[in-house]
Amino acid sequence: MNKENHSLIAEFILTGFTYHPKLKTVLFVVFFAIYLITMVGNIGLVALIYIEQRLHTPMYIFLGNLVLMDSCCSSAITPKMLENFFSEDKRITLYECMAQFYFLCLAETTDCFLLAAMAYDCYVAICNPLQYHTMMSKTLCIQMTAGAYLAGNLHPMIEVEFLLRLTFCGSHQINHFFCDVLPLYRLSCINPYINELVLFILAGSIQIFTIVLVSYFYILFTIFTMKSKEGRGKALSTCASHFLSVSIFCDSLLFMYARPGAVNEGDKDIPVAIFYTLVIPLLNPFIYSLRNKEVINIMKKIMKKRKFCHILKQMSSPLAT
C-alpha cells in the first residue's frame, strides 16, 4: 500500500541537456527557433489546405492532419523543455509526466497511421489512376482519418495504463528532456519486463503496418515498368516526398523503441529523441511543400495577390488625401 501511495504522489526532475550557462543559452535559442519555425510552417500549411479548394483532396487532407499532429508532438514537449533551461524548479508531477507522454504518443501513433493512409493513396494514384476517384472516395478518406485518430488514442491509453502500474523510487531524476517511457522504466522499483514487452509488440506492429511493404512494392514496380520517362518522373516526384518522410520517421521510431535492450542504454537515445520529436516535425512541411509544384504554385499566387493588394493600397492612399 505504501508503495502505491508513493507512486501516486511521485514527482520527477527533468535534468534536460546541460547545466552549463553558455551552452544553455545557445540551446535555448536553437530549440526556440526550431519550435517557432515548426509551428509557423505546420499551421501555415494546415491553413493553406483549409482555405484553398484545390487542395481538398485525400492526399492533402491526410497531409493536413499529419502536420497538425506534428504540431501537437512539438507542443507536448518543447514549452516545458524551454522553461527548464532557466528554471530552478525542474520538477514535474507523475500525472503531468503521464499527460506529456500521452500526447506525444498520440501524435506519433496517429502519424504512423496517417502515413499508412497516404501510402495507400499514393498506391491507388500510381497503380490504379483510372479508378482513383472510386477507390479513394471522400467517405473512405474521412473514415481512414477518423480511424487514424482512434488507433492513435488506443496506443497511449494502453502505455499509460501499464506505466501507472509501476512503482518509482530512487533519485526521481529523469535523464532526459521530456517524460519518455524508456527513462521511466529505468526509475522503476519493479522489473518493467511486461511494459517493455507491450512497448515492443505495439511499436513493432504499428511500424510494420505503417511501412506498408506491399504498397511500396507495387508502387515501385508500376513506376519502373512505365514506358514513358515523363510519366515515370512525374510518378516518382508524386511519391518521393512520402517515401522520404516515411523512411525517416519509421526508421527513427524503430531504432528508438523496437530494438532489444533499448531500456539499458541510458541517455544514448537522446539524439534520436531530438530527431523524431523536434527535427522531423520541422522538416515535414518543407519536405511536402518544396517538392510539390501544386502547393508552390498556390503559394506564389497568394503572394502575388498580396503584392497586388499592397500596391492598390499605396495607390489609393494619395487619392484619398
UniProtKB/Swiss-Prot annotation:
Locations listed in the record: Cell membrane
Extracellular topological domain: 1-25, 78-97, 165-196, 257-269
Keyword presence, Cytoplasm: no
PROSITE patterns: G_PROTEIN_RECEP_F1_2 (PS50262)
Membrane topology qualifier: Multi-pass membrane protein
Disulfide linkage: C97-C179
SUPFAM superfamilies: Family A G protein-coupled receptor-like (SSF81321)
Pfam families: 7tm_4
UniProt keyword Disulfide bond present: yes
GO annotations of cellular component type: plasma membrane
Positions of transmembrane segments: 26-46, 57-77, 98-118, 144-164, 197-217, 236-256, 270-290
Any one Gene Ontology molecular-function term assigned to this protein's record: odorant binding
Family, per entry: Belongs to the G-protein coupled receptor 1 family.
Record protein name field: Olfactory receptor 5K3
Provenance organism: Homo sapiens
